[in-house]
Amino acid sequence: MKLIKNGKVLQNGELQQADILIDGKVIKQIAPAIEPSNGVDIIDAKGHFVSPGFVDVHVHLREPGGEYKETIETGTKAAARGGFTTVCPMPNTRPVPDSVEHFEALQKLIDDNAQVRVLPYASITTRQLGKELVDFPALVKEGAFAFTDDGVGVQTASMMYEGMIEAAKVNKAIVAHCEDNSLIYGGAMHEGKRSKELGIPGIPNICESVQIARDVLLAEAAGCHYHVCHVSTKESVRVIRDAKRAGIHVTAEVTPHHLLLTEDDIPGNNAIYKMNPPLRSTEDREALLEGLLDGTIDCIATDHAPHARDEKAQPMEKAPFGIVGSETAFPLLYTHFVKNGDWTLQQLVDYLTIKPCETFNLEYGTLKENGYADLTIIDLDSEQEIKGEDFLSKADNTPFIGYKVYGNPILTMVEGEVKFEGDK
């Protein structure tokens, strides 16, 4: 058994003194003071905040096929360092988990290497090509968390509709990277004033919002749970809000970088600032914040997307899309939104725990007696600088290097086992 002493937990929105007794994989007791019995391992939280473990429904672990960027082991170590105890990896790997054979191989890699709980997606279409549906019932039987072709949008309405019908039959979500290929125009950043200043092709807002508008109507017709990945535009927020008001089962996520940065933060032709969807305008960012606070957007997900340094050293027009986020999400959001009084600590924790779990009917995301001992101990008071050399991910492609942040996890536990502690 383990006993976390001298911690603070959120109760009714306030930090309260609490000890947590853990028996195996579950929390046995939470109380203001618990006397240790013989043989109990004591973990001294030293007055720090003990949070439910975070749940990230959108990460890229790159394995199999992209191990030079990230592996299941390094990606989940990075997740643990960031306080995440559950992650859901996208299927844009090689091979794609689009068959029982491929999914079984992926699951074995996870079983052998993962440092946190991993709930893998299966693809919607074979090889994510948008031409042939996968076998939904067979992949659900293997353990598919949900279905997505993330990395690309499903381009034809008929294929998306047929996929939604199949997903509804097996009671799983369709999770969509919304991007109309006919509207990308070879873009490498947001189509706006900054792209014009830099002379870089831009991706317009409608590239995303048009596909969401199509899909919410398809989801209504199919009776399917439809989840929108990494919402980035004000038009998308409006479409999702209207769909929810109409009673359509649509949910959505937003990334930390879209909440924190805009096109105005891009200093020049620097691919560290290249992600998909791109950093949008100030108006878009404000709409995302409003949508998160009013419940239009359900949760926060990182879209952790590691790449090799030489790949991101290329010009924006040639470099791959994506930034890492597992190790920086909570500190950045805590520093920029909670420390300055825009959000409460409870709000932020909910966006990373209860909200994603409610979105996908997961049994995690809370600290409660008889619940899983998934938790992270966080130092809310000490300032640290974000440094790439401190990352446990293979990659450090993020524009937040050098930022000074509070709220750094110092210990992460998954089902009662310590998976990250300090610099270990």
Swiss-Prot record:
Note describing how the cofactor binds: Binds 2 Zn(2+) ions per subunit.
InterPro entries: Amidohydro-rel, DHOase, DHOase/Allantoinase_Hydrolase, Dihydroorotase_CS, Metal-dep_hydrolase_composite, Metal_Hydrolase
EC assignment: 3.5.2.3
Functional pathway: Pyrimidine metabolism; UMP biosynthesis via de novo pathway; (S)-dihydroorotate from bicarbonate: step 3/3
Cofactor(s) the record lists: Zn(2+)
Record CDD domains: DHOase_IIa
Catalytic residue positions: D303
GO CC terms, sorted: cytoplasm
The entry's keywords: Hydrolase, Metal-binding, Pyrimidine biosynthesis, Zinc
Chemical reaction(s) catalysed: (S)-dihydroorotate + H2O = N-carbamoyl-L-aspartate + H(+)
GO molecular function: allantoinase activity; dihydroorotase activity; zinc ion binding
Family: Belongs to the metallo-dependent hydrolases superfamily. DHOase family. Class I DHOase subfamily.
NCBIfam families assigned: PRK09357.1-2, pyrC_multi
Function: Catalyzes the reversible cyclization of carbamoyl aspartate to dihydroorotate.
HAMAP family noted in UniProt: PyrC_classI_B (MF_00220_B)
UniProt-recorded name of the protein: Dihydroorotase
Organism: Staphylococcus aureus (strain Mu50 / ATCC 700699)
